[in-house]
Amino acid sequence: MRTLISHRQCVTSPFLISAASPPFPGRCFKLSSFTPPRHRRFSSLSIRNISHESADQTSSSRPRTLYPGGYKRPELAVPGLLLRLDADEVMSGNREETLDLVDRALAKSVQIVVIDGGATAGKLYEAACLLKSLVKGRAYLLIAERVDIASAVGASGVALSDEGLPAIVARNTLMGSNPDSVLLPLVARIVKDVDSALIASSSEGADFLILGSGEEDTQVADSLLKSVKIPIYVTCRGNEEAKEELQLLKSGVSGFVISLKDLRSSRDVALRQSLDGAYVVNNHETQNMNELPEKKNSAGFIKLEDKQKLIVEMEKSVLRETIEIIHKAAPLMEEVSLLIDAVSRIDEPFLMVIVGEFNSGKSTVINALLGKRYLKEGVVPTTNEITFLCYSDLESEEQQRCQTHPDGQYVCYLPAPILKDINIVDTPGTNVILQRQQRLTEEFVPRADLLVFVLSADRPLTESEVAFLRYTQQWKKKFVFILNKSDIYRDARELEEAISFVKENTRKLLNTENVILYPVSARSALEAKLSTASLVGRDDLEIADPGSNWRVQSFNELEKFLYSFLDSSTATGMERIRLKLETPMAIAERLLSSVEALVRQDCLAAREDLASADKIISRTKEYALKMEYESISWRRQALSLIDNARLQVVDLIGTTLRLSSLDLAISYVFKGEKSASVAATSKVQGEILAPALTNAKELLGKYAEWLQSNTAREGSLSLKSFENKWPTYVNSKTQLGIDTYDLLQKTDKVSLKTIQNLSAGTTSKRLEQDIREVFFVTVGGLGAAGLSASLLTSVLPTTLEDLLALGLCSAGGYVAIANFPYRRQAIIGKVNKVADALAQQLEDAMQKDLSDATSNLVNFVNIVAKPYREEAQLRLDRLLGIQKELSDIRSKLQLLQVDIDNLHVSRDEMRL
């Protein structure tokens, strides 16, 4: 199955092809392109950028990737199909049918969509917007010629004609319009001849080429396949047979350009079948090339001891576990492919990567090591892609072939003996101005087992070389420095000064005492080997007389050092095994540090989410306390109404219950229950109690509205706070039921019911009854005393006795009158008692209304907060578990590193 382009949201198949083993067609071709932004922060790692700053200087901004430039190259699955449309085709005719065809093509086969600008700028922009919304993250969208429109719609890049802008200008313009992207924009070049194609691929740094459909274009493609290492898409002529298409793909064409007409005729389906067929055939052929007899001694691990074999197997197991944990902790971390690749290469040949500035002589050094001029040399950048050199024992010249493989590597199979156990990789210069080539080198460095840094004697340790050395420190790589072109020095003293300069500064940069440096003249060594190439059967090391030329002798010393890596019985050979095993260990340690930083940040974010949720709940509780404080004013107003009514009633009682109110007393005494309500009691009902009750009902109604509006407003604010704080967390868990919303509306209005149960008429009647009783007792007492006195004087015989009887009866009347104020005060006390009881009852009712409202508010917010808190807590628990797993795997890696460091110690020595 072919790997998907990297910007799709797919993390289920992260195991990319080994960067050092010969890759298979159909895998991912790394290109400099823009892709739609991802979800979270997992692909932007918390890693310090040390490429352009001093080692002790802290970057002010967070580096966006593991690589010093801060940019990455996306991946494109090839062979594939490129759909080329015209804006008029999209906007005119049956638009829905066109978009439907494109949609189905994107789902089945198309990886790149190019829209031509034959229409007006406005129509092109509108068509680009339509396609952008349709393409989404399924493919790359390129705009022909119009960099401004590509920038405006956020396209993946542009396709430029020969007369268009330079590729580097277009790329820089697109990068400037989207500074937040970590991926380089994609720039394609539509070419017509070999010369323009060569310029576009080498000098301009185009990402891929598009050819026409004519016979001449096919011939151009045949010529380009021999010299161009970037993908080439050929336009379908419509009359090729499947066999011809398959042959084109086998020859190295990366895919076909199709049109809307091809979609309507289902031609894309047939082409897709051809692409799949080419993948199967090329995959089979490449596997056959890899299954060479010399391949049986993988990684040069010959005659390993049981202890060493055990460590190798243990490392594979621990690193696979590390990969699983990294996938679990950071599913979108693409850099884990570095570790996956390194683990897959443990059993592969030792990987020696040649790095350095362009024109430092990297290709010449490699040619000298191989004993033949296999690689192109020049004063301008000649290596535009990663060039992978593998061993082949087939001596036939036609079998010494190089292939462009879909993972971005140019793989050459050569019969050089040194390649049997060491794979050599040539890389673009560290100082090339084309960012795509620089990213190639930066991304390949972590995979290296040994870095051979080629310095040019005329400019040793330039600024770009120093920056590159700082970048490589994070991968803990071993360096071998080659001071090439050393023959430019006039004498040994100048050479020694240069060697001292390089060693002293590299010691400081790499913080190491052991700096391995060989001053050589690769060109002289190569010429010496070529001049004696007729000496068949002799080893390359014996070709030149060591004493004949110090330049050749110095190169021979370099070769001896490299060949010593092949013998595991020597100290250098043991170091090779250690370096081979430490390559994935260094990558694992670097990735673990990044993942641990991410997990720590996520833990902090989860804790902050919990704290934020608790803060919203606490804020609600504080608001409830604030409402309780503000409710005091409402209670005072309500109690004031009761108190005012009480005072008026008491004052009325004091005015009414007087002995001078003879007419009122006679009315109460002689008419009794049959008498109508007097003016005083009518005043109590109509002018005091009725208005007071009306005002109280109005006040308590407003109080209930105040409670409801405040709780509803605060509940709504809390709900919005949760939704605004976590806008993406909206699912069934956060959907509130009707009962929950009813909490904010629910109120029993106990205080209002308390007042509604009171009746002004009933209360005034009770008061009138009490007043009637006072008058009846008082006036009745006076009347009884007078009647008794009359009867006694009529029956008593003497005057003295009459006077005594009158005195006694008068005393009884006096007692009745004397008790009148007491009875009046008793009524006032009764009124006060009733008023106090009512006030307490009303205050309790208002407090209950407040308690119910605030309790419902807090309950509502707790219900709203529950799913958010649970989600944050689950996330925190999961992250804490991941932290524990990361800590455990780091401990395992540390123990494994100790075993690797002790590889050179035998079991007997370990026992001692």
From Swiss-Prot:
Keywords: Chloroplast, Coiled coil, Developmental protein, GTP-binding, Hydrolase, Membrane, Nucleotide-binding, Plastid, Plastid inner membrane, Thylakoid, Transit peptide, Transmembrane, Transmembrane helix
Source domain of life: Eukaryota
Coiled-coil intervals, chain numbering: 877-904
Gene3D superfamilies listed in its UniProt record: Aldolase class I, P-loop containing nucleotide triphosphate hydrolases
Assigned GO CC terms: chloroplast; chloroplast inner membrane; chloroplast membrane; chloroplast outer membrane; chloroplast thylakoid membrane
Subcellular location: Plastid, Chloroplast inner membrane; Plastid, Chloroplast thylakoid membrane
Mode of membrane association: Multi-pass membrane protein
Binding site for GTP: 359-364, 521
Transit peptide endpoints, chain numbering: 1-54
Keyword Repeat: no
Pfam families assigned to the protein according to its UniProt record, in alphabetical order: MMR_HSR1
CDD domains in alphabetical order: DLP_2
Chloroplast intermembrane side: 795-801
Protein name listed in UniProt: Probable transmembrane GTPase FZO-like, chloroplastic
Organism of this sequence: Arabidopsis thaliana
